[in-house]
Amino acid sequence: MFLEAAAVMKPFIGTYENKVDRKGRVSVPAKFRAVLQAAEYTTIVVRPDRERGCIEGYGMDRLERLSEATPDLLDEGTQTPSLERIYDILSDSEELPFDPTGRVVVPADLLAQAGIGETAVFVGLGRVFQIWNPTALEASRGRKPRASASQGAGA
């Protein structure tokens, strides 16, 4: 099943803005759900991206590939930066199941780390996607936040 799912997994593309409720529930974009459901996944996997200040998301196939690619070097006492990164990804990842309406409950600590409040922006990046605070996303792209940009346009 893993190899078949990895072979047919389509890329996550597009940018979508969705509301987050007080319980941390957010609707995963229908196009992202379709990619995952085509590979027979009923969950997303998320982890904090501390370098960018967002949440990274993907299908379970990514964790399976990382796990299979991880050499058993700890027993040999060998530790490399790439191996440490793989272990960080594996240990930071959380699996979030879809509810019947396509929502997931994002843990409060992940939302806080990414500065996400009432609105989240999903950004497709091929094999992975990111979940951003809208203002932080605009800033990371070198743009003024939408509210500021529209205020500045009239001046």
From Swiss-Prot:
Residues 15-62, 93-136 form the SpoVT-AbrB domain. The keyword Transcription regulation applies. It is found in: Cytoplasm, Nucleoid. It comes from the Bacteria. One of its GO terms (cellular component) is cytoplasm. InterPro entries: MraZ, MraZ_C, MraZ_dom, MraZ_N, MraZ_sf, SpoVT-AbrB_dom, SpoVT-AbrB_sf. This is Transcriptional regulator MraZ. It comes from Rhodospirillum rubrum (strain ATCC 11170 / ATH 1.1.1 / DSM 467 / LMG 4362 / NCIMB 8255 / S1). The gene is mraZ.
